[in-house]
């Protein structure tokens, strides 16, 4: 069944199955690791909640970071979906307090975040330090804005392929791509592979910094 045609109930079940599949196939443990999920209204529902559940099952301390709101609302297919509580306002979030970063997609979410200078700088700081980052679907739009994709191999939702190439990325059509601590995937259908690689890279911790990721 195509992912876009699944019901809300089926989608929630998929998130649970994805997390369970991850736990059976990946023994990495994130106990003691603190992970930020940067998002705002219009994030793709499964692309936040599925990684969130996988990270929590790996015993990570996960915080939702967002600008200016107590809670944010997902977009689900053609309408608004579930809400999630914001744990840390963007204005108070410090990259040095986190071990890794997740960037969910959704058409609305990254388009709003990329216009927030504090959000762009927050993302860039993870690359400057060499901390692992996972971005899915339209999430890599934030990587373009932060100017951290030049020379990197990655994937994304197909509609932003040209934008990523123009920003200097090597775009490939794979379900999950790992490049020196950066994990990317194309769509919600890739979540099982995305979650597994995300946790694996987050467990490894800081990666060697690249000069292209340190541009001002």
Task: Show where each model-derived region lies.
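Catalytic nucleophile serine of serine hydrolases
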Residues: 137
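Extended, subdomain-level signal for the structured scaffold at the beginning of enzyme domains
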Residues: 15-129, 133, 141-153, 161-216
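N-terminal amphipathic/basic-hydrophobic helices that include classical n-h-c signal peptides
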Residues: 1-22
């Amino acid at each position: 069944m195509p992912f876009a045609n699944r019901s809300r109930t089926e989608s929630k079940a998929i998130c649970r199955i994805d997390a369970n599949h991850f736990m059976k196939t990946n023994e990495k443990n994130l106990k003691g690791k603190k992970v930020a999920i940067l998002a705002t209204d219009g994030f793709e529902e499964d692309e936040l909640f599925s990684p969130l559940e996988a990270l929590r099952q790996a015993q990570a301390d996960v915080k939702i970071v967002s600008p200016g709101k107590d809670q944010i609302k997902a977009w689900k297919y053609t309408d608004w979906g579930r809400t999630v509580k914001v744990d840390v306002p963007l204005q108070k979030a410090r990259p040095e307090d986190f071990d890794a970063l997740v960037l969910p997609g959704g058409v609305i979410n990254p388009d709003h975040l990329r216009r927030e200078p504090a959000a762009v700088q927050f993302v860039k700081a993870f690359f400057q330090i060499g901390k692992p980052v996972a971005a899915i679907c339209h999430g890599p739009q934030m990587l373009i804005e932060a100017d951290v994709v030049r020379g990197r191999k990655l994937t994304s939702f197909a509609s932003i392929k040209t934008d990523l190439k123009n920003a200097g990325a090597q775009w490939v059509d794979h379900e999950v791509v790992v490049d020196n601590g950066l994990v990317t995937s194309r769509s919600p259908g890739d979540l099982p592979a995305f979650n597994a690689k995300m946790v694996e890279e987050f467990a490894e911790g800081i990666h060697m910094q690249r000069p292209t990721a340190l541009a001002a």
